[in-house]
Amino acid sequence: MSAVDKAELQRIAQQVELNRQRMESIEQQVARLEQIRLEQLQTIETLSAIPPNGAKGAMIPLGSGVQIVADIPPKTGAVIDIGSRVQAEKPLDEAIEILTKRTEEILELMNKMKIEFSSIEETTISLANVFNEQIASLQAEQ
């Protein structure tokens, strides 16, 4: 096997490995985005369920299986992150609108990442085929 053949095979193998790592990273990012999207959908559903005249004795989840009982006044607002860790109280309709927009943006990002994943996967398959063909031709020469 010539030095050029070895170098080319090593380059292809490295590229395949880099692509595999990138695909794994994209999968992890998409999974995290999906968790965020589901959390936002649940929040939208919860906010939408608050009646305009408020609610008495509503159970508000704090996390870790803990809830607090509270009264929700009529025409209440929700405190929402508006960016750069700045939070502001917004009317429920506006908070729902903001969350809906964020959910749509996450879906767009997830779709772009899935397209990128498919492109990398296609390239990786092509490189793997070239690698296998070169290995087969080298073995045939011996």
Regions found by a protein language model. Give the residues of each.
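Intrinsically disordered, low-complexity regulatory regions in eukaryotic proteins
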Residues: 1-82, 86-142
